[in-house]
């Protein structure tokens, strides 16, 4: 029988000092012996996806206390990728994932907490907390802040739905008037919550459902809707049950590594491909799998991508649907239901509610359930009122979207495409693979060949795009922006958005060892591995080299002879200490970022730290 971890600090005469300090936090004699549960919050006024979380930790804590536990809340940092985008702040985004994971480990282990409720939402916060949860392997439930409502504005006598990416594209489009750009900017992000499309934050919060670590509705129920409060109340009650099951009944099925198993990771990736999730999810799932000591690699993702169809299409891949529409169609469980009926899921998995996949679908799939309260929950919709308050409205759609032929979520028979929304490509400068979000690629450019325009920083590429130096047919290559080379593996949302602003969204490709925002669409290929700073062949590409992209056949090829590449590699190595570094780039890199770079691996490993350098 496992012993409560917290007993280390609450039991025995020699722990009198620790108990004295616990008493100073409000604990009493009656609390010593109860499970101490960490409420891991991420409230900040910097991030719209987290601005409403201040009081939600207290909400969870009250339920924990009522159920017989002791709740202790702490906060992690949270970076807003959209605000950090397009300048030096983006260097800090991905490294913040490791800091978040470490900070959770530090707090939980330093104070011997028995379990956790993780209140996350945006891009690196959910992955960081997920990595920590699987590293610590104590009972955990995730409950995120929820998606933002889609923006809406009237243009050309039509009401159109908007998001952050629309504001970026129109802000740089010379054909768009100042007044229209201003109107879009003011309308794009109307409420608190994670940005309203299938961007990284919402993708990851959906994936926690598929991994079994969050409750049905977590990924899609709007931040502003009153129904979302129930997820927080349930999490506080349920975590005490899970904690007691493990520590008092020796039930290891309550632990996250037994819930988020290899089969669950495969289901999560299957969901990701089917819903056209952010390419960043590949990075984060690979990293989380390593923390769980699960053998889940790019090879597994490649195999899944070849057999899973695209059953859901959401912004940025279309302007028709946002997360509020996914929820109306049944949310994550709705997509999982269609995947299950297509025979594409592992059914022998459980979630934090203790339900198997078939049981979850029977209870929560809108195409199967007889429970009117579940159907009512999935009718929760937007109010269209600007707010930063959680649970501030109770609007509902008149009906569910259960049209699996023409609706937001499709059945296998009516799939958007037989190919899924993500693909792994391999070739002579991406030997370990690279990732493309096929959901956002126009059919006309699934095969594309063009001359390279090479840039050794995102800034130079942006200047060239906006300066008209990139023309139709070009393949923009941005290198030395990987985990080590950046450092920090910047997102390339501005270059991809500005290609659209210049009318080149369907006429150019962009390839990088950096990564892309979940808001990116178009022929945007990232995570090229190995990265240039690690000696990857992307560092050998020269201006004018032809690059052939063949998504249907999963290929990407630099059309240069092996002999020429060998000669270029020899010349690169001859640069000595300057080898595999940018030739003409000035960038101030802090000590903290240099420390990150010294241990960073390439994207095919999840951009995690190289344990071999630490003797691990």
Curated annotation (Swiss-Prot):
Keywords: 2Fe-2S, Amino-acid biosynthesis, Branched-chain amino acid biosynthesis, Iron, Iron-sulfur, Lyase, Magnesium, Metal-binding
Reactions that this protein is recorded to catalyse: (2R)-2,3-dihydroxy-3-methylbutanoate = 3-methyl-2-oxobutanoate + H2O; (2R,3R)-2,3-dihydroxy-3-methylpentanoate = (S)-3-methyl-2-oxopentanoate + H2O
Location of N6-carboxylysine modifications: 124
Enzyme class: lyase
Positions with a binding annotation for [2Fe-2S] cluster: 122, 195
EC numbers: 4.2.1.9
Cofactor: binding details: Binds 1 [2Fe-2S] cluster per subunit. This cluster acts as a Lewis acid cofactor.
Keyword Iron on entry: yes
Family membership noted in the UniProt record: Belongs to the IlvD/Edd family.
Assembly and oligomerization: Homodimer.
Function text: Functions in the biosynthesis of branched-chain amino acids. Catalyzes the dehydration of (2R,3R)-2,3-dihydroxy-3-methylpentanoate (2,3-dihydroxy-3-methylvalerate) into 2-oxo-3-methylpentanoate (2-oxo-3-methylvalerate) and of (2R)-2,3-dihydroxy-3-methylbutanoate (2,3-dihydroxyisovalerate) into 2-oxo-3-methylbutanoate (2-oxoisovalerate), the penultimate precursor to L-isoleucine and L-valine, respectively.
Protein name from the UniProt record: Dihydroxy-acid dehydratase
Organism of this sequence: Escherichia coli (strain SMS-3-5 / SECEC)
Lineage: Bacteria, Pseudomonadati, Pseudomonadota, Gammaproteobacteria, Enterobacterales
